[in-house]
Each structure stands twice: as structure tokens, then as C-alpha cells.
Amino acid sequence: MERTNTTTFKFFSLGGSNEVGRSCHILQYKGKTVMLDAGIHPAYQGLASLPFYDEFDLSKVDILLISHFHLDHAASLPYVMQRTNFQGRVFMTHPTKAIYRWLLRDFVRVTSIGSSSSSMGTKDEGLFSDEDLVDSFDKIETVDYHSTVDVNGIKFTAFHAGHVLGAAMFQIEIAGLRVLFTGDYSREVDRHLNSAEVPPLSSNVLIVESTFGTATHEPRLNRERKLTQLIHSTVMRGGRVLLPVFALGRAQEIMLILDEYWSQHADELGGGQVPIFYASNLAKKCMSVFQTYVNMMNDDIRKKFRDSQTNPFIFKNISYLRNLEDFQDFGPSVMLASPGMLQSGLSRDLLERWCPEDKNLVLITGYSIEGTMAKFIMLEPDTIPSINNPEITIPRRCQVEEISFAAHVDFQENLEFIEKISAPNIILVHGEANPMGRLKSALLSNFASLKGTDNEVHVFNPRNCVEVDLEFQGVKVAKAVGNIVNEIYKEENVEIKEEIAAKIEPIKEENEDNLDSQAEKGLVDEEEHKDIVVSGILVSDDKNFELDFLSLSDLREHHPDLSTTILRERQSVRVNCKKELIYWHILQMFGEAEVLQDDDRVTNQEPKVKEESKDNLTNTGKLILQIMGDIKLTIVNTLAVVEWTQDLMNDTVADSIIAILMNVDSAPASVKLSSHSCDDHDHNNVQSNAQGKIDEVERVKQISRLFKEQFGDCFTLFLNKDEYASNKEETITGVVTIGKSTAKIDFNNMKILECNSNPLKGRVESLLNIGGNLVTPLC
């Protein structure tokens, strides 16, 4: 496979696509790789039963998630962990791990995979050994339901799947993309398990089982009634009943049904008249696991456990049978035997023993995989091959029936679940080709109305080793950390206060006495808050797919691995005027400037330098100013140098300073000032002469420029036709009109004559104070 594209999600199945068995799927996105399940195919032996591991480099896998303990989902895990170049981490739920060890140990011992001879007569060494199983077991990590685990940017959460004890569906999130893998799941509440959950968060991709395609199950109570009636009628005629089951899972469900039925019909069946046996090498060990995890089952089981103070899985009418040597086969009996596919073990031995008699019954209660004896016998063949010598055939005269208690969803349950998930992309797995194809057609037909819209649903049913590529454009969300969080809260509070003031003021004027806090709250809630603008640094963690928004001062604390470099800009400009004139223009533009060095006493201010450096200063004719906090202006002779740290605000201020320097010698104000102040005198005389030439109207015009910048066309200044005529008795006014809010200003006395809005009044007063400070040296 090619390297994962940064925006492409890749699905690649190594097994379990267009087949049931050896489930194993690969997910790749943003350089992360997730492996789902590692099973074997019950119909095959040896290496042929494995997923196609050679088709993918397993060293790329970051994590492997096991959905449940069934062999077709977990049996090749020791092989992956011990016999391949796999280096990732493995996760499963607590009950799954508890059962996994015993189930796999029995798998190695019983099946032909662990100890068979090839047709050439050479010993098959097996896929893995008991030592491999023990070593792999210690490396497996467990997860709790509903807890989210983060592994280097891959987040996953386990939810109840309802298939067997410990079965989980996993919702995986990588860089904002969410994928839900159902594994085998059931939406039916049975006698001991809850139904599968619907995760609260939506998913972009749904990988869902399609075991039964478009088939529909009978109601559970009907199936239970059929099961008990068939078994009852068989044993009443002296027959024996064989139920091939997996050692764990549906076996416990059927035992709960039979134990209750035997208790209800104790006169005919109880008291040892018709014994029920649970034949498995792991019988007692398996049941101890179920007895341990009662509290992870449904309410009915937990209630029985609380009320009776006895474990529901301690059966009154069922006995455990470890091997057939202890079985006295003298009359009617019911036998639940593993494995469920009848490929080997106790169930196969009993099948060959009982199938020649027509009074006996083989009752298939689970899903039968193609290529297995369970699937073959459902065809009711006349003979079956012997497991010890396939050339010898055994007549089949027994009755064969199927009543499915497989904990898989039918079509209606699957469709309802898919609609609740509402994923735009659906990938079908774990189903034979024909049922899966029918399910795909049914889903496309169901979602046909969405075709061509933004909500169109895409359905895929890829074969093994066929890649599915999906393009996604994720939404990135940054997390604010550090001091910038306080800055955001501060800005929010300011916005809220301004909105309250702006909304409440008109109501106060209309009916000041009737204003209450409830009306105030309603006014604020009517309108959404404005966007808040804050400045900071966006740090991307590509490994964990996280974005942090923080201030520069917090960078070292939250990201110590990052180093910072501060870039300072420097621009030099030739000037052909005195420093006094430049200083005057700087004050006009910015109101104030901090004096760092003033050798020629241009500013009449004491330079702000450190005490220890005062003695080292020599008179070089420098004028150094600090403007707006970070911009440094140095003037020596005819050269002016501007230095600043790059950011949006500093760049804007620096541009303004450079514009002043480039035009200072030709500006009208400069010409007017210099025409009276270029003769030889000190700075005090320059100021006094300039002040004497600027009259009241000029002062107002300077201040009005601030209002024009702030309010634009909303501000109007009223002057005489002869604006330089000295008429001290006439008041010079200005008016600011914003919507229904109006402020009338007396510029002679620098005060507000009238204003009907407190927020507007505050803004105008601030501008009057700033304007007064700016022109004071000139008045």
C-alpha cells in the first residue's frame, strides 16, 4: 500500500470481507494505523486459516483492537504478536482478556492447527505455541467501557456490543475523523446481555457487520418456544439432542433457557430423568468467568443475583462433562458441546456417534460458516466423512434443525442502528458475498432520496485486500491554554457590559423607575455576543493532532521542546530637518513617546536609562524614542532608524512613523513651524513661537481629526466661513450621530453639551481627553 495521504482515509481488509471468518481490518489516516481484530477461518487449517498478513507491513500498526474472544476475531493474535514484525499495542476489554487465555489454550490443544500432520506426513509445527500464548497475554492491555484511551493521537472508546460477554464496538478518532467499528453486535436484549449501545458522538465512517444480510429473525420468545418443544419431543421419544455451541457466548444463553424449562417440567424431565450436559474442555473455567462478571450483564441477571443471593450461572439441571470417557450414554439426553462448527473436538465425536439414528436431533443454534461441517450437515446429506479417516463415511439419519440464537443483528435491527449512527460512509464486513450484496442494495435503496445531496450515503462492500479510499476535510479546533484564557474571559466580560449598557440606556430614559434585572437579562440574551479578537500563537502537535492557542510568554511552559526566535525589523530613512520637528510630529501622531536618550536636550525630558549606564553615556547627538511600547526610533544627524518586533500592531505603527519621516520636511505643518523657528534658539522658544501662531480654530481642527478617524461620516464639525477669524464669543461645536444616539460637543470648553447614550458619551469624553493632551503643547 502507498503511504497514507494526509487527507485520505484508507480501509484495507486482510480478512472477513465478503466472507465470515478471519476478521482483520486495517485503518489508515494522517499517518496513523489501526488494526481491528485478528481471527482465523474455522473452515481452514494452518497458515491457510490466517488473514492475508503478507499483504500488509504489520510493523506500521500503532494499535490493535480486539472486539471479542471468538476464534474468528481473536485466534491469530498470538501469531501476530509473536511471529510477525508487529510492534504496536493491543487492547481488549477485561472479560475478553479473562476468557481469551483459556479459549486460545484449548484452541491450540484441540484443533488440528495446533497438532496436525500434513498430507506429506510431516509434522505441522502449528501457528503458535503455548509459550507464544503466555508471552502475548502479558502484553495485552485492558480497557473499560465508555473510557477514552489516547495513544499518540489515536483516541478510542469501547461501547457494549451485546454479542457475547465482553464484546465491544470501538469508536476511533484520529485528527477529528471518527470511525465506528461494530464488530459482531446484537440489538436484542436476551437473557443475560444488554443490547448494543449507540455512541453519543456521530461517526464519519461506519464499519458494520452484515452476517445475516437482509434476513429477519423471529421474535426471541418464539425461538425459545420452538427450541424447547423440539428438544422435549426428541427426548420423549428416547432420542438424544446435540447442540454444537461455542464454549462461551450463546452456550450460556441456551443453558439459561434449558435450566428454566427443566425446572418448570421437573416431573417429566427433572431429577436426572433426562440429563443435560455441557461438554467442553473449558466447561468449569468458562463458567467461572461468567460467574465473576455478573455485574456486567443486564438488569434481569443482576436482579436474580441480588434477590436470590445465588449466581444465575450455577445451574440446577445441567452437569459439566470434560470428556466422553466419563459419559454414560444409556438413554435420552441433551448435550451442549463445543466447538460450534463441528470441525473437531467433542461436538464432532458426538455427531459421528449419534447421526446414524433417526430418533436423534442435531440442533444448530449459531451461525454456520461456509466450508465447515456445521454448514454441511444443514444440507442434510446422506453421509458425513469421519474426522479420523475422511475416506470412511458415516450414514446420517438423524434429524437436523436450525433455530438461530446467534447474537447478530438481522436486517431491520441493522438498518435502525445504521440510521441512528447517520454516518455518510458505510463499509460492510463479516458477511458472505451474497447476503452482503443484498444488504448493500437494500441500504442504497433506503437512502436513495439522499443521493446527490450533501447528506448522500455511500455504501462499500470491498473484498479482501481491496482498498477503499475516502477523502475528508476535517475541522480543526484549537484549545486555548495559559494566560490567554484569562484574556478571553476579560474580553467577554467587557463585551457583555457594553451590550448591557447600550441596551439598558434607552429604557432608562423612557421609564427609569420600572427597570428591573429581568428586563436587563432579556435584552442581553436577545442578541448574540460579538466575536472576541485576541492575539496569540497557534501551536500544532502533528503527533497527537492537537492545536494549542497560547500567548508567547506561555510557550516555554506548555511546549518546552520549542525554541523561540524574535525577529526585529529595521528601516533607515534620511531626514533633512531638525530633531525638534520630528519629535513634534511624533507627539502629534501618538500623543506621547518615551525618551531613552536625548543628548541635545531636544525634548526637555529626563531620559529613562539605568543608573549604572549613565556614566558610560557620551554626547553623540542621539535622540532615541520608544513609541507605543515596542517601536524604537533613533535619530543621529540626518539618519533616522526605526526598529520593531514583527506583529500586526507594530507593523502598522512602524509604517506610520516611516511615513512621518519621509514627509516631515515637506508637510504643511512643518513648513509653518519652521518658517518661524529655524533661527538659532533653544527648544523652549520653538514651542512658544509655534503656540503663538496656532489659534483656537486650528486647535479644534487638530482635535476634530481624531473624531473624524473614529466616527467617519457620523461626525460633523461646525465652523465659520472665515475659519481663521477670531471670534471668541461664538461657540465652535461638533455633533456625533450614531443611529438614535447623538452627542453635541463644545470644542471651546472641551466638554459635552448633551448626549443621550452613556457608551457614546464615554467614547467622546475619552477622545476629548486625548485630543486635549495632544494639542496642549501647541496652545
Swiss-Prot record:
Gene3D superfamilies: 3.40.50.10890, Ribonuclease Z/Hydroxyacylglutathione hydrolase-like. Zn(2+) 2 binds at D72, H73, D184, H430. The active site is at H408 (proton donor). Its cofactor is Zn(2+). Changing D184N: Loss of endonuclease activity. GO terms for molecular function: 5'-3' RNA exonuclease activity; metal ion binding; RNA binding; RNA endonuclease activity. Binds 2 Zn(2+) ions per subunit. The modification Phosphoserine is found at S517. It comes from the Eukaryota. Keywords: Endonuclease, Hydrolase, Metal-binding, mRNA processing, Nuclease, Nucleus, Phosphoprotein, Zinc. Changing H408F: Loss of endonuclease activity. GO terms for cellular component: mRNA cleavage and polyadenylation specificity factor complex; nucleus. It is an enzyme of class 3 (hydrolase). CDD domains: CPSF3-like_MBL-fold (cd16292). One of its GO terms (biological process) is RNA splicing. Belongs to the metallo-beta-lactamase superfamily. RNA-metabolizing metallo-beta-lactamase-like family. CPSF2/YSH1 subfamily. Present with 17400 molecules/cell in log phase SD medium. Component of the cleavage and polyadenylation factor (CPF) complex, which plays a key role in polyadenylation-dependent pre-mRNA 3'-end formation and cooperates with cleavage factors including the CFIA complex and NAB4/CFIB. Has endonuclease activity. Component of the cleavage and polyadenylation factor (CPF) complex, which is composed of at least PTI1, SYC1, SSU72, GLC7, MPE1, REF2, PFS2, PTA1, YSH1/BRR5, SWD2, CFT2/YDH1, YTH1, CFT1/YHH1, FIP1 and PAP1. Interacts with FIP1, PFS2, RNA14 and YTH1. This is Endoribonuclease YSH1.
